[in-house]
Amino acid sequence: MMVPLLLSTYFITAVYGATHTFHWTTGWGNRNVDGIKERPVITCNGEYPWPDVRVAKGDRIEVYLTNGFNNTNTSLHFHGMFQRGTNQMDGVPYLTQCPIGPGDTMLYNFTVDENVGTYWYHSHTDGQYEDGMRGLFVIEDGENNKNFPYEYDEDVMLSIGEWYDTTVDVLTRKFLNLNNPTGAEPIPQNLILNNTMNLTWEVQPDTTYLLRIVNVGGFVSQYFWIEDHEMEVVEVDGVYVEKNTTNMLYITVAQRYAVLVHTKNDTSKNFAIMQKFDDTMLDVIPKDLQLNATSYLVYDKSKPMPEQNYVDSIDDYLDDFYLVPMDKEELYPEADHVITIDVIMDNLINGVNYAFFNNITYTTPKVPTLLTVLSAGQDALNPFIYGTNTNTFVLKKGEVVDLIVNNQDTGKHPFHLHGHVFQTILRDREFDDAKGEKPHSFNDSDHAAYPSIPMKRDTVYLNPQSNMVLRFKADNPGVWFFHCHIEWHLLQGLAVVMVEDPISIQNTASQHLTANGLQVCGNVKVPTQGNAAANDSDFFNLEGQNVQHKSIPTGFTKKGIIAMTFSCLAGVLGITMIAIYGFSEIPEPEIKVMRNLHLNPEDVLEKTSSSSVISASNSSSLEDSRNQKKKFIFF
């Protein structure tokens, strides 16, 4: 099945003006997205895919999101938006808002006055965006993108991702399960491009395209290349960069790249557009899993479609660490606040495999963290009130923060920080467990020199068993998530919270929940005041807060000791009963059986007695032997 690009983008909302208003209602419908299997997907106003949105810098966005599900909450996050002064519009349940209950409507209302470039939006609830609740979001730099720093002829959006043939709720029940003790992530069935497979992109010769590529998947990073065509990277995650030419991109989930592609003058041949799984992220590779997906760059649709394109090596992809921002912003000063977090994956006492930062798996509070900030007064400066299982750090206004992430896990992790772009000032190499290498934590006295002009973006990958250092300024008051964007790992709890300049949040009217936001809370019966335990009379009393399951204890517990004791007693009693049975007299029915078989009971007994280490002596008569056994039993 080949789908032309124009069919995949017909649902783009491309309007210009001061305010853009959208009314979206969630629902379910059956679609055959990958051309192989029909399955339920999340629809928008009964349609699928969700609309891609294109606006201009300075425009206002109004999205009325109605939850059309019968029994499931929902939410909407505009990925990469700074939301300066409008933290309540960031769309994270139990962090910046209450979940939107069935039948309810929430208005997301904000202005895009700082962001430009390539973004996307998605549900931030229970992995729903893997079921299709997502779309691309482009903010042009001035009307018709007139302030974009590079020349091009046409602007094209491409979303890439993986696709499952089963809904996320079913997969999650199997994933977060004691029968999956290693935490093996569900394996996707296919790779998709613009919500389909075998896409055709018809191009004009000698034309420069601005190609915006967004990985809207929830798990696997992808390699992306176009046969016999170079790509010039000009933007990453909304940050303009100096041109950097490459033949291949490595794109983690949630990352965005804008590249310039110049087409050929010759129209005699069509070319392959290639996607490839990063199969190192898969615990197992099923025999029927196709690791590559082929779409088509078409100069002449009357010509044959190309075969899939192979490359000599997938290691020759662009390393985004070395990209240079066009604004050439220098390395921020030495950090005022250093936060070190260690990534581990482990099991808790319920047998389920979880993800941890510093041995804490993120557990939602009873009161959304932003509402705790707004109701806590000066106590908002103390991270304790936000709960012992939210991994919350309080940042002072304007301080430079170093976020050191040590990966004790053997897998890659793409990390995303809400409300900011950060400078990636260090990313160590992979340390390969298969080669016997151990996890390598950051060493402040022994590391590579930081770049003078670091790369900036909002989503970056961390190598296996490695470390990285992200530096950013606490210049955007709000409650911001930092989390792994592998959706399975977020469901496992791989997240921390940054409460940034809480007193400024309290003193800014636009940071307070609207009447609609408070009504949403009331409808799902979520408290709007108090600490993580919903205690609004004593913010330092966390009794009743949500907490993670207990760790698996080391050594023997009381239950284990008792179980072992009774097991040993049962074993001793069992051996004793066997011995007693062995020395008991032969029942008359058994003697009759022996005689019917022409066996002498005395001979059988003599052989049995001579082989027993317990017997006192061999007997010459059956009666003597019986008497000995009776005495033994009596004893």
Curated annotation (Swiss-Prot):
Residues 581-628 are cytoplasmic. Keywords: Cell membrane, Copper, Glycoprotein, Ion transport, Iron, Iron transport, Membrane, Metal-binding, Oxidoreductase, Repeat, Signal, Transmembrane, Transmembrane helix, Transport. The chain crosses the membrane at residues 560-580. It is a single-pass type I membrane protein. One of its GO terms (biological process) is cellular response to iron ion starvation. Its main location: membrane. Its EC number is 1.-.-.-. Cu cation 3 binds at residues 124, 418, 483. Cu cation 2 binds at residues 79, 122, 485. Residues 18-559 are extracellular. It is an enzyme of class 1 (oxidoreductase). This is Iron transport multicopper oxidase FET3.
